[in-house]
């Protein structure tokens, strides 16, 4: 948001204080400042001069030599302008001026000295097009010797305020509101209050009809006649331009001017158009689904039922608090208007912004929550400004409408001990009273007990509890004046947070050790995405009004990770990501919220890839990574069980079992799910239930499993057998483990194969077993003996050797 120092000076004498003092106080006690810049300082080097004489250039037919007077001295200018004559007042850029990327220098043109350049409005960046030098004859304020910056009311300092730092302060979203705050902080008087403007309404005028309902906090309208639509005066134009608002005409400009000055949006309708619909009868009501009409920005959005509209005779003429309709807008030939001043519930405006995608200056203020009692004072102020800005004889009917939220009182009770304890300093009752009264609170004391009546422009959402009073006192006094007190605390060994420790181990292992990238996602998603993993009836719906794609809390992390892969699938050939996140269920505590460690891998395999060998190799690679992680966190006793999941491919889905509990799963995402997420490559997804993982890790972490390395060479035995397509590969390794062969250290699957010479419905699985002897070197006889044992074991249990 941009604020003009010159404009704020209308309300309190800020220029008497000094810019450095103002900036420091804003930064310490009010909000963050993004920038402080003089407005168009380059125009100080462009002066208004009078052309005293014009002569032809001796060496160029298209050039003229002009002698000009700036009020104190004369100078010579060579110009090619054809629209100038003797006696004209024109802008002259003197040597040293910088206009855009051009610097004006004293030069010679065809042997004749030229001390500057006549300027057009386009060259001064005041207009996109111009037809020659800007002629200022007869324009109010155009005086010889005056700079163009002064002539245009551009001599000003602009404060660029960080909007995020005043989101909770709707009273600061205006020049008067900000000036009022600075006056309180700097002990300055309020010299003019626009909310106290007066106006004599014409009681004989026919007033508009306003249908009362509960769809607005406050809504008033007034008919205005004898309006003349002309360009705004320089003062109005300059102030709007300095705040980044496009100048349109004197009527529309006043509406924008009032909004920037007082923080209250207004709207003007062309009364002639409203009467053409059967008379002026305004109503605040909701849109019908699919309803549409043309807006001022030339769009015609299809409206939802939650959007609030302004209707005349039942027909939409504006999206309430957001934007007016094109047909009812003020035209160049408009002579009668209807002024609207209203306050709508901030929640309703937020819905309209979200649904239409339109974020106007008005809606930004409405969504913060405005004080409803300001609607009538704003009408009186706007009428005074219209009269000043080109409509000297206008008349207005008495406003009609309703106010459903009359002024309420918010009283906060606390005591001096509470305030001093929170701030960490000792303030007297007088100190506290002085600060709060400067901030427009009404204060009374009963002993050490304080009662503060909150000013109406702060009581809606801002100051409501004792802690808010403490903040007001602290920031006004200045947090920089409060001494830092060292924290007094016992030195104790911190309690170990096992969950956090294991989470760090997981992140380190997967990111540093395996090359995964961590991602962060919101917990909001669409209801249909919860169908992937569980009963949608158990979905936790978000009570706030949210779009459909963010209407529930997720019940697993799979949708979030698949969307991450979709976003990145065209940028990387291989994607490996993981996330720590929570899933939510509409069931009693403590099972209503669970934390998961989930991961997804997308190798460079198209979703239509049919080479089972490649797919199995990828799957085994990821499975081996998970097993190495389990070993890293000292979980050695586990097995994989075949268990289908609705989001996994039916032939590639495993459950991880530890201590007879399922703690996770792993599998290829089902092709139908890949298609629904528009994924082009195969995806392997896995998830571990983190609380269970922490519990098992806590049990195992202190158990020593260290084995002294053998000084003798290790040996390996490979064996390949046929098993069913859906048979668990752990069956054979479990059989071998139960044989308790002394030298057997571990065994695992290192390859699988199906098709070719392998019978239909079967697959060839190759196992590798590592042998370690701590007493002597392996002999060929002992290795063969163990190998024969394994072959016999396979045959005994119905497995066919390959």
Curated annotation (Swiss-Prot):
FDX-ACB domain segment(s): 710-802
The keyword Glycoprotein belongs to this UniProt entry's keyword annotation: no
Domain tRNA-binding: 40-149
Molecular-function GO terms, alphabetical: ATP binding; magnesium ion binding; phenylalanine-tRNA ligase activity; tRNA binding
UniProt keyword annotation of Protein biosynthesis present: yes
This protein's GO CC annotations: phenylalanine-tRNA ligase complex
Keywords: Aminoacyl-tRNA synthetase, ATP-binding, Cytoplasm, Ligase, Magnesium, Metal-binding, Nucleotide-binding, Protein biosynthesis, RNA-binding, tRNA-binding
Catalytic reaction annotation: tRNA(Phe) + L-phenylalanine + ATP = L-phenylalanyl-tRNA(Phe) + AMP + diphosphate + H(+)
Disulphide-bridged cysteine pairs: none
Required cofactor(s): Mg(2+)
Domain B5: 407-484
Binding locations of Mg(2+): 462, 468, 471-472
EC category: ligase
Pfam family for this entry, one: tRNA_synthFbeta
Main location: cytoplasm
Cofactor binding summary note: Binds 2 magnesium ions per tetramer.
Transmembrane segments: none
EC numbers for this chain: 6.1.1.20
Subcellular location: Cytoplasm
Subunit structure: Tetramer of two alpha and two beta subunits.
Entries under HAMAP family matching the protein: Phe_tRNA_synth_beta1
Family statement: Belongs to the phenylalanyl-tRNA synthetase beta subunit family. Type 1 subfamily.
Name of the molecule in the record: Phenylalanine--tRNA ligase beta subunit
Native source species: Leptospira borgpetersenii serovar Hardjo-bovis (strain JB197)
The encoding gene: pheT
